[in-house]
Amino acid sequence: NDLDSLCCSMAFSSKGFVEAGKLASDKLEEALRIASENGKHPVLCDMSPCLYTMKSNFGERIKLYEPAEFATQFLVDKLKIRKLNRKISLFAVCSAKKMEVEEHLKELAELCAEEVVVIDSNCCGFAGDRGFLLPELNKHGLRNIKEQSAGCSEGYATSRTCEIGLSKHSGISYKSIFYLLEEATRE
């Protein structure tokens, strides 16, 4: 209940609102504990940065997964995937790297597209929502992306804010890896 008010807490804690962050995190953890029946069911979080925050704050009871990790562990063996004839760009966001799940992203992309270009960058520089206020961080973090993604028709990642900056600086549209999986399984 009241799902639209739930938040991983990063928006609060990253700005120094520790108490508000703890309240938001505790409220989300309790809601997910109930929804997952005390960890009986896995929980998918579509944003890697939010998942990283949740994993840092929550106890061990709830099984939390990021998009590509969830797809490779629970979906791909149940789906009929056809490899799309295109060259795509792939960006593993910072939090996915910190959780060491970027290989799931690459594995999923390679199941869905003929050619996958993995962007070589440690960080896009968007830094949560800081890219809105300090766009030069994002511009600097992605200063080489246009060359690296040359010839790619589109790009995929696991963080909407990162995807905003990636789209702006690469010249191609970036979106969730789930869009690629959906298209590769469409009949």
PLM regions and their residue ranges:
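Iron-sulfur cluster-binding electron-transfer modules in prokaryotic oxidoreductases
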Residues: 1-187
